[in-house]
Curated annotation (Swiss-Prot):
The gene is aI3. This is Probable intron-encoded DNA endonuclease aI3. To endonucleases of group I introns of fungi and phage. Disulfide bonds: none annotated. Mitochondrial DNA endonuclease involved in intron homing.
Length: 174
């Protein structure tokens, strides 16, 4: 306690000397860019991450993941800290880019499974070699039940990639 009082009362000691990394004001920040998948069009650039988060509704964790790993956001957009020399600046407004992202989110989310741990499977008929692809085990079980088979999801899980027949089908992840 005495040490705290000493530092608080000492006039030349400054407690506000913390340097903020990635300064949110953008004064010392590196520029960030949003390109199309092949990097030929630059849709947006800013020195602040918060602009991408607030303006376009991209979650900060999602933004950082795609920025750091170099993966494509919505399988279409590339975030980068480097300016690509051959990229042309888009003439779209910020509102148009935000609308484009909203439309792509709806389209992309329709193609996703509802549960992140869902397993996409293929059932292959042993006799005809006909393949039936399903986005989840549940839909594969419904298919088997509609074919008058007493199907069970637990048993189907055990048969994935084992080549053990289940009601005339083999089950594989895809």
């Amino acid at each position: 306690m005495v040490l705290e009082q000493y530092f608080l009362l000492l006039p030349e000691f400054n407690l506000n000397t913390i340097r903020v990394s990635n300064n949110p004001s953008g004064s010392a920040a590196k520029p960030l860019f949003m390109y199309n998948r092949d990097g030929s069009i630059c849709y947006y650039k800013s020195t602040k991450q918060v602009d991408f988060v607030r303006t376009f509704g991209i979650h900060k964790v999602t933004f950082m993941k795609h920025l750091e790993q170099g993966t494509y956001y919505l399988n279409k957009y590339l975030f980068s800290m480097e300016e690509l020399p051959n990229a042309e600046q888009s003439d779209m407004t910020v509102e148009q880019v935000a609308t484009m992202l909203d439309i792509d989110r709806v389209t992309n989310n329709k193609n996703k499974t509802l549960v992140s741990f869902s397993v996409a499977v293929t059932l292959i008929n042993i006799e005809t070699k006909e393949e039936h692809k399903f986005p989840s085990l549940g839909t594969a079980v419904k298919f088997l039940k509609n074919g008058s088979y007493p199907a069970d999801q637990r048993t189907l899980v055990k048969r994935i990639n084992t080549n053990i027949p289940y009601h005339g089908f083999t089950c594989h992840k895809y």
